[in-house]
């Protein structure tokens, strides 16, 4: 039950009534009408921008239109107050029974509460896609958690989702990996390798790879020229690194449906899938040979003063056309990326989401242009950029890892603080804002630690039910039974706050999913937990407000119904974020 969607529909009906009465013109576009919680809860339970966005089209001023709507909505028995604020916002206050009905719906629906109906179209979410050259670092972890939670959120909002990892196994970096692993192979055989040469990967994580190479090949590779041993070592090292990455992802509870190899795009004759894609774009008139003018300011890496094979990305909103071939005749990264995204479209994706590091900002327009081109406008791409993570301990920067050589590994952080703090705190800030992750603060047991505060609320709901079972042995305390409780007894402002927040859950799922912003759900869960803790504390001072009162069965069952609804929402929301909902805090 989504009261926000219900009142969007009700406002549409009210506008239709006003149109039939001749007070508004026909054909108003309601696409921008929104019903949401007011910024100040003191203004009401719902707010709508309908008058503001429709006034021009309706040839009237926003306040006058808002007053017309308010008069119409006051006739709805669910509305106890309709008031106009500011330039034309319409605020509604609803009857308590509306929220009681939401609580009953939450109890009856169980895990389905807040979930959206299945919608058409396939969403492909690509996330992590870390180069297979070493263990994952904390920055990778942020993108991994964001992508995984976003995929969960989209599924909860009714979308069919494919979770994908792109293995960058065809670039120069994997040759560097092979040479680095070969050095560790020689070391495992007893060679003195000295300092790791500049340009190779220095971390200790390649020592086990070198040992396994020695166990598998003995000294045979030492007798081979680089042209012979490099592909052997490269394949071996890539497989070892992907095993390492998969282990790191599993430790964080991250899953993928598809691992897509870049190499598969370049195999076969005529340049493989990349060559075929360029030929297809050429037939559409979207590939030509030309010379790019020098851009103003700093020259980008892919600009060269020569005739080049170019993609007409400006035809789809990009700033400049983009090269597809390097001067040595090999494909640019962009060419491979176009072919890869064309593969996603060919596999049925209509909505593509790439979760990337903040350093990929220049990539966005060109790839959005490419997706529009290869899909003939049937698919779209949203690129979500994840900013840096600053790792701190008690406010001080954390030193690099010896194992990784240049950074702190994700696994080290998970092993120290646990999966739940990593996941929740990675989502408790918008993805495009730099995140300070303090290893000391995320394990504090205080209100200032959001993951503890939300999980503690869920654990407290479990303790309420343990207490209730002791006080009322044999009482059916299932959600289905509690749905029959007399919710009109929930008259305290703290109870009303919790009911309003429970009612917002379906809209939070819908809005956060549409915006591709899982942090909204994390913020909401903290607000819901805060309302619950506040009412819990009220009961310490006022015994009549305690959740369990052995001398007042009716009030107890009413409050237990509210707690059960809240508990279900906390568990559901934490599940979408990939965080556990504990019954006890240890």
From Swiss-Prot:
Keyword terms of this UniProt record: Aminoacyl-tRNA synthetase, ATP-binding, Cytoplasm, Ligase, Nucleotide-binding, Protein biosynthesis
HAMAP family: Arg_tRNA_synth (MF_00123)
Protein's GO biological process: arginyl-tRNA aminoacylation
Species this protein is from: Methylobacterium sp. (strain 4-46)
InterPro entries registered for this protein in UniProt: aa-tRNA-synth_I_CS, Arg-tRNA-ligase, Arg-tRNA-synth_N, Arg-tRNA-synth_N_sf, ArgRS_core, DALR_anticod-bd, Rossmann-like_a/b/a_fold, tRNAsynth_Ia_anticodon-bd
Domain of life of the native organism: Bacteria
GO CC term, one of those recorded: cytoplasm
Subcellular location field: Cytoplasm
Gene name of this polypeptide: argS
UniProt protein name: Arginine--tRNA ligase
